[in-house]
From Swiss-Prot:
Domain of life: Bacteria
EC top class named in words: transferase
Cofactor: Mg(2+)
Function noted in UniProt: Catalyzes the phosphorylation of the hydroxyl group of 4-methyl-5-beta-hydroxyethylthiazole (THZ).
Gene name of the encoded protein: thiM
Pathway(s) per entry: Cofactor biosynthesis; thiamine diphosphate biosynthesis; 4-methyl-5-(2-phosphoethyl)-thiazole from 5-(2-hydroxyethyl)-4-methylthiazole: step 1/1
The name this protein goes by in its record: Hydroxyethylthiazole kinase
Length: 269
């Protein structure tokens, strides 16, 4: 998968301005909307069960994020996801904190059983817990533990019949056959709440314009990581507040040539 080919997906997102329907959490809603707008996508946050089916049906992609979990939101996710499936709208799922509590884990396992997913994205612990693999987790952001992340991602892709993405120091994308590792990004991303949730929504924008979901995921991760690296370089010693603002700027400003120059994506099988 050549880096130039990956970079061109960014141009397609900006040219197409895809509508991304987000059922996400209250902590990250504003940041997610601003990030998608900066990228060039069109965000909508619609949660009411009375309208989610209609909204999901006209979207380019549907993103389900269970960060601040409530029963009414779970119901809305299921309604929206099934409507999206009927209209062949790709559905992305971010199982935030799967493994942290029994209820959260039950929901994280139930949604993929009810909805056909185009993609699932989380840290290693979250993805492992979704597919009943042992991996310790502490809180909703814990991704460290003992295990083989590539093996977990591959098992998830095969078991769920989807593209599985595990993010961390290195990002892994696999459909069970093709596996790509992306080595872009910056540690300061972990100091700004919502950067993982925004990433899943950004991936939704890429999936909306690229039917090869492995390529879409790799393109989104590479783009996102390069934007973070450039933003970090421009805000050295200024802290996470300045980084957050500059990161939004870079989501708007990163070019194809930036991705070609700094992108680090390697297909390992």
């Amino acid at each position: 998968m050549h880096i130039t080919e990956i970079a061109k997906v960014v141009e397609q997102v900006r040219k197409t301005n895809p509508l991304v329907h987000n059922i996400t959490n209250v902590v990250v809603t504003n940041f997610t909307a601003n990030g998608l707008l900066a990228l060039g996508a069109s965000p909508v946050m619609a949660y009411a069960k009375e309208e989610v089916a209609e909204m999901a049906s006209i979207a380019g992609a549907l993103v389900l994020n269970m960060g601040t979990l409530r029963p009414d939101e779970v119901e809305a996710m299921l309604i929206a996801g099934k409507a999206a499936n009927q209209q062949h709208v790709p559905v992305l799922f971010d199982p935030v904190g799967a493994g942290a509590t029994l209820y959260r884990t039950e929901v994280a396992r139930h949604i993929p059983n009810e909805i056909k997913l185009a993609m699932i994205r989380g840290n290693a612990a979250e993805i492992a817990n979704v597919i009943h693999e042992k991996w310790e987790i502490k809180g909703v952001d814990a991704g460290t533990g003992n295990g083989d992340s590539v093996a977990i991602a591959t098992k998830a892709a095969n078991k769920l019949g989807t593209v599985a993405v595990i993010t961390g120091k290195e990002d892994i994308v696999t459909d069970g056959k093709r596996t790509v590792i992306i080595r872009n990004g910056h540690p300061i991303l972990t100091k700004v709440t919502g950067t993982g949730c925004l990433l899943t929504s950004v991936m939704g924008a890429f999936v909306a314009v690229e039917q090869d979901y492995v390529k879409a995921a790799v393109a989104a991760l590479t783009f996102y990581g390069v934007a973070a690296e450039i933003a970090a370089s421009k805000t050295v010693d200024q802290g996470p507040g300045s980084f957050q603002v500059e990161f939004l700027n870079q989501l708007a400003n990163v070019t194809v040539s930036d991705i070609e120059q700094y992108g680090k994506a390697e297909e390992v099988r």
